[in-house]
Amino acid sequence: MVDGFGPRGYPNGFPRFSYDSRPDELNEVTVRPLDAYGALAYLRTRSDVVADRIALQGWSNGASATLATMSATAPGITAPTPASGFRAGLAFYPACGLKGQFADGIKPYAPVRVFHGSADEEVSPRRCAELVAKSRALGGDVQLQLYPGAEHGFDDPSPSRQDDEANADATRDAIPRAIAFFSGVLKP
């Protein structure tokens, strides 16, 4: 797991509801994809990693970075394909405003799945639904799984999240769905 926050002075990540005040050096659209592609390059040097079967997954702001990274126009890679970039991306409850960079949608170069709660109190599930619809209209293989009543961080295993029935239901569905997605796209 790449830690783009700690080395840049944010060892605990961002405080909740701080989207508009985050520093440029942690921009999820222009900087964090570079971290992801740096990690990909490193992983491909390892003998214990199958170099052409690496996927990307992120949660919250990391999910936003995942969406930007999976774009065919992401910084850090030229003309990406599933063979040269990541095989797939999985984004759990991203903020889909993406600094206004993808107002017309994202055309991912590999399949992307987005999991979001309809009652997310931190970022807009409506905005993600709009982004996914625009991205699909561009021909992107991107799908949204919207969980009724689930909140931001619905898959957090703590009782404070899992005692909420909608969060628990979403978690029980999302985990096997994520495993099945990655199993399908990462098979030889």
At which residue positions do the language-model features occur?
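Serine-hydrolase catalytic machinery in alpha/beta-hydrolase-like enzymes
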Residues: M1-T45, D156-Q162, D169
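Active-site loop signature of alpha/beta-hydrolase-fold enzymes
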Residues: P7, G97, G153
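Soluble non-cytosolic domains of exported or imported proteins
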Residues: L26-L34, E122, R126, Q145, ...
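Primarily recognizes the serine-hydrolase "nucleophile elbow" in alpha/beta-hydrolase
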Residues: L26-P108
